[in-house]
Amino acid sequence: MTTSAPLLCCSIFITASSCFSAVLDRLTYRWSDLNTREVAEWVGDTAHIRQGSTTTELTCKITVEPSEVAFAINSFGIPSQWTSISYKDEADLAKKQQQLRERASTHGIKMLQEGNKFIVDYNWVVNHSTKDLVDVARTIRNTARRKGYRSRRELIGAIASFAQSMEYRIPPDHRTNEEGEKILTAGAMMPLETLTNRWGDCDSKSLLFASLARSIDLVDVCFIVMDKHLFAGIHITPEQDDDSIRYKGKEWVLVELSEAWPLGRIPRDRVNAIIQGHYEVVALD
């Protein structure tokens, strides 16, 4: 998501994030893994399930430290007042914009070269989240294994369906910190915040999935970005009928995280956009 901030002011309605205000202990998560059902055929976006096929239900308990959640949230985003720049001339403006660009990059925000626009630094968010989520990812993996999951694709499906199970809600472009300061987040949340809030949009849920998968070296992940939407690509061998792209000589199976979709299946309108080349790939280093 891209956020534009005017040079002199920023006037977006703010809502406060309070997911770490309550004491967190062991959180229980229950979800269905659609990858375990047997699809007889797809007709457009509708799956016709083979008679007698069932969907595996997964449950796990996860412990999250409130201090870690608070630290993750506070590390991400920049004060809105930073985006109000006073300058003498164009040279002074360019200098101050570069300084802002460098400061923002240390808080997970990219300032674009064209104009005063800000986007999420997906690499920064994932790289600053894997350590916090490794125990969560191991818990999900162990839960799946107890249910008979063995292959890498099956385990990826367990983690993807976990992220998909979070309620779909769009975060605001800003949050308010404990001091009442407006913080620009470009409409995304840190994965720990998404986890404890139990909701997020395509960006935040994809960041949660990528961070979980990367934390246990389960699979390489990239992001596919198109107009007002984002989904993930995973570097595994495509199965028959999987939706996939080829990027830098590798096959990437597509994963829709905003809603419950099986690995390798995305909405048909998104496939048409892919075929027409209306997307870009964000590699996660």
What do these predicted ranges mean?
Residues 1-8:
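Bacterial N-terminal signal peptides that target proteins for export
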Residues 9-16:
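Bacterial N-terminal signal peptides
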Residues 19-285:
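A structural boundary/capping signal
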